[in-house]
Amino acid sequence: MKADENKAMSSETPNRIRITEYLDLDIDREQWMCNRCNHVLGSARENYKKGCLLHDRDPREVHPALVAATFNFSPDPSWVRIVECYCPRCATQIETEYLPPGHPITHDIEIDIDRLKERLRKGQFIIRGQRLEAVE
C-alpha cells in the first residue's frame, strides 16, 4: 500500500465511524474496515463477516468443564458452536458468535447507508472523533 493510500485510510479520517471496538464504517467509500490495520473487509452493504477469517471453535475447549461429572456447564458441541471472526491482515478478533450447529453466520449489523448519508448531508448528524453525533 502506498503512503498516500495509507494516510487516506487512516482511522483519523473524518468519514470513518466506529461501529464496534474493532470495526469501522467508511461512509464515503461504503466499506467495512478493521480499525486496527485499516484493512477493507468488504462492502458496507453486505455482511462484514464475509471479509473476515472464520474459526470454528470446540466449545469444550473454550469453556472447559470445571467439574468432572456427566452433567456440567461445559457447552455441548452438538448444541452450540463458537465461531470467531478475525481480520485477515492483522488477526484482530472482531467478533465471536455462539450459534446452533448448522446455523449460518449471522448478519448482525445492517446500516441504512443511504439514509445515514442523507442525514449527514443535511447536517442532522456529524462525525466527531469517529463517533456519530446528532445535531440539535
Kindly give the residue locations of the regions a language model identified.
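Short metal-coordination and nucleic-acid-contact micro-motifs, chiefly zinc-binding Cys/His arrays
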Residues: 27-30, 80-83, 109
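Intrinsic disorder/low-complexity detector
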Residues: 1-26, 50-72, 76, 98-136
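Internal, hydrophobic beta-strand segments that form the core of beta-sheet-rich folds
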Residues: 88-93, 100
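Short, structured motif recognition centered on aromatic/hydrophobic residues
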Residues: 31-44, 48, 82-85, 94
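Short beta-strand-alpha-helix junction that forms the catalytic/metal-binding core
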Residues: 76, 80-88
